[in-house]
Regions:
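Short, contiguous alpha-helical
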Residues: 1-9, 13-16, 50-94, 120-123, ...
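Short, charged, low-complexity loops and linkers
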Residues: 12-28
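A short, mixed-charge helix-start or loop-turn motif at secondary-structure junctions
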Residues: 19-23, 101-108, 143-147
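Acidic/histidine-rich alpha-helical segments that form the ligand environment
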Residues: 28-42, 97-135
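Cytochrome P450 catalytic-domain "roof"
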Residues: 42-51
């Protein structure tokens, strides 16, 4: 069990996401989210996945691509810090990542499968994490993090976007 991150384990901004998660077992929370997320994504059709609630907003495909890319980037941060690397990591710009993904031209089912596989990889990383690794620290985007803060951030990020999908996109 990882325990919940303390205030000094991430910059205040990130607690917007971390605080959306209840419980204190990061690995279990990330694992529990998988079924709910896949159920939601599985109920969205190819046509619906191209829906945008406003012209300047991402499509559902772009939202899921963003969720997946962000999880991949943050899981790497968790791995980097857990293994004891000391070099700071650069920032992650979601707008650059989104622009480079061309997500609307990838089939919806492929996005869902990619999320599933990335999440399984994240679960495996966290399930096999040594107990003392959860409190190891590192720097990314010029901000301090612990591994457990990153894990809670991953879970909170999905919670945040699933909530937005339900409120603003679904039912389409």
């Amino acid at each position: 069990m990882s325990g919940r991150p303390k205030e000094d384990e991430a910059a205040p901004y990130y607690f917007t996401y971390i605080n959306q998660v209840t419980g204190d077992d990061a690995a279990g929370i990330v694992e529990d989210q998988l079924g709910e997320s896949l159920s939601l994504f599985g109920g969205i059709s190819e046509e619906q996945s191209l829906y945008r609630y406003a012209p300047d907003k991402w499509s559902i495909r772009q939202v899921l691509n963003h969720i997946t890319d962000t999880e991949r980037a943050f899981a790497f941060r968790a791995l980097w810090f857990a293994r004891g690397f000391e070099a700071p990591l650069p920032s992650y710009d979601q707008n650059i990542a989104s622009a480079g993904a061309n997500a609307d031209h990838v089939e919806w089912g492929a996005h869902v499968e990619e999320f599933h596989r990335v999440r399984l990889s994240t679960i495996s990383l966290f399930r096999n994490m040594p107990a003392d690794a959860w409190t190891r620290r590192g720097v990314a985007s010029d901000n301090p993090f612990t591994v457990r803060a990153v894990a809670f951030l991953i879970a909170g990020h999905v919670t945040h976007h699933v909530s937005i999908l339900r409120q603003r996109y679904l039912p389409v």
